[in-house]
């Protein structure tokens, strides 16, 4: 996931700087990239038309995310890339019974919420739309993952 595309270039550089990846670039599946204390998943399993998933598409893929949450036993920090990713993570963790909240945390870049022993951090997605326009800069993305690293210590 993210391997060989511009979003991945941004993501893996930030992960590398924060100590989550052994190299700053992933070009293909056998390039030697190794993640440490990090797991990457997605709300959707396919690219939606015009990059705007429908609620039905999100619902169709939800079971995969719930199953991954069930399998991952030592999660302490969740970084949601984009509002859709952040909200999907919150909803999936709530549905899995691992967290409860009365009012849903609001999405804002680098916002951090501690809920039920987990830390949720929101980030703009490193899409070309966000990076080319300057909505997301490298220092902004670096800050998200250094914050995540700090929360693990």
What are these regions (language model features)?
Residues 1-107, 111-153:
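A polyanion-binding, active-site-adjacent surface
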């Amino acid at each position: 996931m993210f391997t060989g595309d511009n979003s991945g270039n941004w993501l893996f550089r930030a992960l590398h700087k924060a100590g989550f990846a052994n190299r700053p670039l992933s070009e293909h599946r056998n390039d030697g990239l190794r993640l440490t204390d990090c797991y990457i998943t997605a709300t959707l399993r396919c690219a939606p038309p015009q990059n705007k998933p429908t609620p039905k598409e999100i619902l169709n893929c939800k079971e995969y995310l719930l199953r991954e949450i069930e399998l991952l036993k030592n999660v302490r920090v969740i970084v949601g890339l984009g509002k859709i990713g952040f909200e999907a993570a919150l909803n999936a963790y709530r549905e899995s019974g691992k967290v409860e909240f009365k009012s849903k945390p609001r999405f804002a870049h680098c916002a951090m919420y501690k809920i039920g022993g987990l830390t949720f951090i929101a980030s703009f997605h490193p899409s070309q739309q966000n990076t080319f326009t300057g909505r997301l800069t490298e220092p902004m993305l670096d800050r998200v993952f250094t914050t995540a690293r700090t929360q693990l210590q």
